[in-house]
Design a protein with these regions (language model features):
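Ferredoxin-reductase
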Residues: 2-85
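FNR/FR-type flavoprotein reductase catalytic core
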Residues: 75-122
Length: 122
């Protein structure tokens, strides 16, 4: 699984019935810009099951933090919402995304719209 780095879950917080967040260890070599997302996932039947998640923690933090909605029948989220401290999680080695300040054109107003967790990318 060279595409992924195995990290360890450090904390899990269930905010309410539909939202949760978790932090993981972070490979020292992982570099990303604020606004990037990473593929994260779990190994299921010997294969990675992964989806794109915005990184909530700033790029200078020692750990990674992610925020998610709970999807009862979601292929990954239904499993991810049940992780515990100490569990292993797969984190992609290649950050990507275009929600970067440097990509925005100067303007008087900035409107940020999103779906799902809403505030996670901001």
């Amino acid at each position: 699984m060279a595409t992924y780095q195995t990290e360890r879950v450090l904390s899990v917080k269930h905010w309410n019935e539909s939202l949760f967040s978790f932090t993981t260890t972070r490979n020292r070599g992982l570099r990303f810009r604020n606004g990037h997302f990473l593929m994260i996932g779990l190994e299921v039947d010997g294969k990675p099951l992964a989806r794109a998640y915005s990184v909530v923690s700033p790029n200078y933090e020692e750990h990674l933090e992610f925020f998610s909605i709970k999807v009862p029948n979601g292929p990954l989220t239904s499993r991810l919402q049940n992780i515990n401290v100490g569990d292993s999680i797969l984190v992609g080695r290649k950050p990507t995304g275009t929600l970067l300040l440097s990509d925005l054109k100067p303007a008087r107003h900035l409107y940020l719209l999103s779906t799902g967790t809403g505030l996670a990318p901001f």
